[in-house]
Amino acid sequence: MLRVALAKGRLLKSFIEYLQQVNQIDIATVLLNRQRQLLLTVDNIEMILVKGSDVPTYVEQGIADVGIVGSDILNGQKYNINKLLDLPFGKCHFALAAKPETSCYKKVATSYVHTATQFFNKEGMDVEVIHLNGSVELSCVVDMVDAIVDIVQTGSTLTANGLVEKKYISEINAKLITNKESYFKQSSEIERLIKQLGVSISYA
């Protein structure tokens, strides 16, 4: 039995859509019908649904053999895992966003302090970065900050709140990661999963 840790939320929705595209209907159906279950089994695969930022920890600790997680999570911290594959779904990007008339960014809110700080340092910008856990758009709408750094997929949330993308920061995509010990002990099961996903190994 191969245990796979999946990130709940946006990435899970994208993963289910991809499974349907590659005709892995059984797995997609189980995930769609999960209700509030956090542990699901299908085709010799046990799936655990966890917060995105926790996926690498479950894999690193050996609780899960494999994980599917956004590259943004992996960039924020070092983990003792194999970053095995780039996956062809879950694509979006980090961006700096603000009101259309704003051109000076002294105070910026984000849930992704590491990414934002790296970006502003690289750009040579002196910015105060404020950490928020969610609804970062609101902080800009009510003028608590000049701008936000957030994940953008379609841009509809920005538009709905009267904000526009000012600067592209970096791309995000889904990655398949493995526990280092499981990579050898369950190599055949991992290879089977990779074939089911219709992708090939290219070390990242």
Swiss-Prot record:
Alphabetized UniProt keyword annotations: Amino-acid biosynthesis, ATP-binding, Cytoplasm, Glycosyltransferase, Histidine biosynthesis, Nucleotide-binding, Transferase
Q: In which pathway does it act?
A: Amino-acid biosynthesis; L-histidine biosynthesis; L-histidine from 5-phospho-alpha-D-ribose 1-diphosphate: step 1/9
Which reaction does this chain catalyze? 1-(5-phospho-beta-D-ribosyl)-ATP + diphosphate = 5-phospho-alpha-D-ribose 1-diphosphate + ATP
Q: Which SUPFAM superfamilies match?
A: Periplasmic binding protein-like II (SSF53850)
Q: Which CDD domains match?
A: PBP2_HisGs
Function field: Catalyzes the condensation of ATP and 5-phosphoribose 1-diphosphate to form N'-(5'-phosphoribosyl)-ATP (PR-ATP). Has a crucial role in the pathway because the rate of histidine biosynthesis seems to be controlled primarily by regulation of HisG enzymatic activity.
| Quaternary structure, from the entry | Heteromultimer composed of HisG and HisZ subunits.
Q: What is this protein called?
A: ATP phosphoribosyltransferase
Query: What is the scientific name of the source organism?
Result: Staphylococcus epidermidis (strain ATCC 12228 / FDA PCI 1200)
Q: What is the lineage of its organism?
A: Bacteria, Bacillati, Bacillota, Bacilli, Bacillales
